[in-house]
Structure formats: structure tokens, C-alpha cells
Amino acid sequence: MLLNTKQMRLRRAKATRIKIGNSRQFRLSVHKSNNHIYAQILDPSSNRVIVSASTVEAEVKKQYPSGGTIEAAKYVGHLVAKKSIESQIYEVAFDRSGFKYHGRIKALADAARSAGMKF
């Protein structure tokens, strides 16, 4: 059975989420589209969103009208880290949702780390 690109990404994401779910840590989940990038911190017990940031938000959109850039991803990473530290969440497991750790995903992760998050 041949899988297309999206099916392969979802398969990788499922395997990663099983490993993260067993660790019982807060999860920094990242999703990207061609035009935007989204980051959420989820509670390990109830899978509810505690903190979120994305390029759709007015604050980010004002500075970066095109949300599909590496600079916008860095800003979202910094913003989600700042919000999580305000919520007293310092350590998370990074869930890249099956995307390659490259480009915008890497930029978001590096910005979150430099803002004080540990993963």
C-alpha cells in the first residue's frame, strides 16, 4: 500500500504522540500550513489547550502580514514560550506533528528554547 505525503506525516505524528503520552509531560504541539504556523501547549491528563500562539493572532499579524515565514515562526515560538512561563510551565515535550525538524519548525523550537522553555 502506497501512502501519500500527508498520510506518512500523520503516521509519524501518531507514533510520536504515543511516546509523548507515556511520558506525562506537557506537550508543545506545532502545526504548519503554507500560510500560517500554530503552537499549542496541551495538558497531559486532559489534552486541553493551556497556552496557544499562532500567526493568525492580531498581534503577530500586525508585525508579520505573511505568516508563512521563518521570522514569523520565531516570533510565535517566543510568544508561546512567554505565555507558558507566565502559566508556570517551564518544561514540555516537543511534538512536531510529523513535520521535519527543519525550517519554520526548527525556528519556532529554537526561539522557544531561547525564551526559556526546556525540551
Curated annotation (Swiss-Prot):
GO terms for biological process: translation. InterPro entries: Ribosomal_uL18_bac-type, Ribosomal_uL18_bac/euk. Keywords: Ribonucleoprotein, Ribosomal protein, RNA-binding, rRNA-binding. Gene3D superfamilies: 3.30.420.100. The keyword Magnesium does not apply. GO terms for cellular component: cytosolic large ribosomal subunit. The keyword Translocase does not apply. SUPFAM superfamilies: Translational machinery components. It holds the Pfam family Ribosomal_L18p. Belongs to the universal ribosomal protein uL18 family. This is Large ribosomal subunit protein uL18. The gene is rplR.
